[in-house]
Amino acid sequence: MASGKFITFEGIDGAGKTTHLQWFCERLQAKLAAGGRQVVVTREPGGTQLGEKLREILLNQPMDLETEALLMFAARREHLALVIEPALARGDWVVSDRFTDATFAYQGGGRGLPRDKLETLERWVQGGFQPDLTVLFDVAPQVASERRGAVRMPDKFESESDAFFSRTRGEYLRRAEEAPHRFAIVDATQSIPEIRQQLERVLAAL
């Protein structure tokens, strides 16, 4: 199928993943340049014209739990069809700020939506497709909360309680335990230079 690679960055809000995403992608691009491959940087929800409109709704409007999950997967189907799959088919590498693990963590772990419902949607939308690598930025909810409080006005998810993020983090770690071959866990409690040292090791292994 695809000759490119698909990498995702995951973690609870405030873990710092977005802070390091551009840095990581610049170094990955330098590594791939000799082979003529490009790094496509994208995000979920979002990444397409429709996806960005759905992102605005999902992050700011209250809604039924199942509606939220369905919209997440609708945006994902569009993202796969228009961005991810074509890029991989060209031989490019794709790095996405969140993917399906986030839905299991947030809508499943955080919101409590039954896992079997999410698995049904996952099979329908993406079949057996999974990231080649998921970089999970792991941090305690209390630390993440302090970081979120230091930035802009929070969206709907960023405003959730520490208890919500504790459940979300727990689901992320459970998924990492189930698929250790796919996950690289970054200790996101460390300083920016220390986190980048961890990411350098991830890059070296690619």
From Swiss-Prot:
EC number: 2.7.4.9
InterPro entries linked to this entry: P-loop_NTPase (IPR027417), Thymidylate_kin-like_dom (IPR039430), Thymidylate_kinase (IPR018094)
First and last residue of the signal peptide: none
Domain of life according to the entry: Bacteria
Positions annotated to bind ATP: G11, I12, D13, G14, A15, G16, K17, T18
A Pfam cross-reference name: Thymidylate_kin
Presence of the UniProt keyword ATP-binding in the record: yes
UniProt cross-references to SUPFAM superfamilies, sorted A to Z: P-loop containing nucleoside triphosphate hydrolases
Catalytic activity: dTMP + ATP = dTDP + ADP
Top-level class of the enzyme under EC nomenclature: transferase
A GO cellular-component term linked to this record: cytosol
Keyword ATP-binding: yes
MF GO annotations: ATP binding; dTMP kinase activity
Keywords: ATP-binding, Kinase, Nucleotide biosynthesis, Nucleotide-binding, Transferase
GO biological process: dTDP biosynthetic process; dTTP biosynthetic process; dUDP biosynthetic process
Family affiliation: Belongs to the thymidylate kinase family.
Known function: Phosphorylation of dTMP to form dTDP in both de novo and salvage pathways of dTTP synthesis.
Descriptive protein name: Thymidylate kinase
Source organism of this protein record: Burkholderia ambifaria (strain MC40-6)
